Amino acid sequence: MLRNIKNIGRRNIECQLIYLLFSFSVGIAGMCTYQLNPVAVDKGGFLRYDIDLVNERGLLVCAILSIMAYLLITVVDKGAHQTNVATMKPYNENRVFWSTFIIYSFLLGILLALYFPGTGMNDTINCLMGFWQNTLQPAMFQMIIYGIFQGIFFMCKNATIAYAIIVILQIFAASYIVANYLRWIARKGIAKWLLILNMIYIMAMPLIGNYTIALLKDTWFTYAFFLLLPNIYDLIHGEKACWWQIVVAVFVVWFSRSNGKLVLVPIMVLLFIFCKSQRKHLAILLITLVVLNSGLDYAKNVRFGGYDESFRESMSVPLVQMAATVVWNGNISEDEEEVLYAVLPEEKWRQNYAFAFVDPIKFDEHFDNLYLAAHKKEFLQTWASMSKKNLTIYVKAYLYHTYGNWSLAAYNTNAVDKTQSIFLKLNNNTGDTSIWGEYLASISLKNDSLLPNDMTELLQGFYEDACEWNLWLTPGIMFLLLNLCTCIVWKNKRYKLMLTFLPLYLCWGCMMIASPASMIYRYSFYLLLSLPFVLTMTWRDIGYK
């Protein structure tokens, strides 16, 4: 009996520590949000702000939000145990699948008709313009888009139809993945009302539909990621997984975005450790991916003569930290200046430093990527040596750059880069006089709604407003909900479910380390689409006996 009392006491202490960990993390994020939000709102004039992160008001905000977060996790954990989300009634799984597939395809079809033949951005148009044009985009994504588009264009001589067919194929793939997810949670015994809520969330969330009719690598990555999550859950829990889905999802995640491999390798290693019966399949799959990746890297070196932009793309945080040190007149030695200004002239560092956005620096015409690629070690040593003397500036620059990933404040829609957050046309982030706009004009590819003009004007106005409302569900809020669920799962000892959430944390970690911007919503599409999975499976598993 005494041992049981000790175990109960130890368990209560563990629970309180988990609750406090979540509470303090929310409090600290809230304090930083309170101090930095004025800067984010006025990002054009952010340099004139002198931010003091830790002061009396900031600590008060931290304390209040920590208390509120503690109450939140306590109430949610208790309420989740008292609400039954399981059902003993078997579902007609085929009915769930096909009804979802048909309804979702129909709704996306209406959206496509409204913005026919679909939307995109300059990265998309680059893929149409030539076969494997640059090293910025994943090679596989470029080659697939180019091959399908040019093949259909060659046969029908109509660029609009060719583009629309690719988007329609994307819609069908997305509808299959969503229908497969709802069939999967039905198989797990989720109550009908919660199943319907999942369906409503996915089908009614404006930006989910917006990205589904946009030809973006982020769309491919996110839907493949969403296809993979239920299968990871099944593998970790020793249940039957669908291996053809795993293979397809893993290949798309790996080759559709540069951080795909960084997400998959740790996950596959963990699955190899915990899923003994599947080790052979996992080993073959990982080896195949590595071999294909090596082959593509070799082909890239041959095609582009060794020119590679991958190192520059991974240096977003160091670049903004070094730029901030220049702008705020930090302590920089002559040797450090030599490396720094060989990459980019001093006046360009000062001119191009921006809040939460590194592209003006790395895409400046004076940026010497060849020097950077040839002097990686010297550049990293310079960055590290500057950090020792300018730590305060480095921390401030890091918080500025990653603000959109963790901030608890609702987006000021004027501060968001809408050209890469809400997609309304083919060349969404460029003008008609740009090289991308001119290319679209040369092949007569343009947006033209299939609906009547009056209806088009009405629906587009409403839909665009709805997309802006959707921006209020920020990456920071979604990450807070992920942390809330993870802590509740941890407290209830559902460690296998915690492992299932790991890919989401790896994606977020990549954004915090190497993302070029944090006020671009498309980078967080994976969180938006995966959120119902996280909430539903947390609710189900902590009450599952």
Locate the predicted segments by residue.
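Start-transfer (signal-anchor) and selected internal transmembrane alpha helices
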Residues: 1-28, 50-108, 542-545
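Membrane-interface anchor segments at the N-terminal boundary of transmembrane helices
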Residues: 52-55, 161, 165, 401-501
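Loop-to-helix entry region of an early transmembrane alpha helix in multi-pass inner-membrane enzymes
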Residues: 57-59, 143, 147, 155-176
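Extracytoplasmic catalytic/substrate-binding loops of multi-pass membrane glycan-assembly enzymes
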Residues: 115-128, 136-152, 157-161
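Short acidic/glycine- and proline-prone juxtamembrane loop motifs at membrane-interface regions
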Residues: 122, 210-220
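Transmembrane-helix motifs of polytopic, lipid-linked glycan transferases
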Residues: 165-188, 227
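Membrane-interface alpha helices of multi-pass inner-membrane proteins
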Residues: 243-257, 269, 286-293
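Membrane-proximal stem/loop segments at transmembrane-domain junctions that anchor or position
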Residues: 305-446
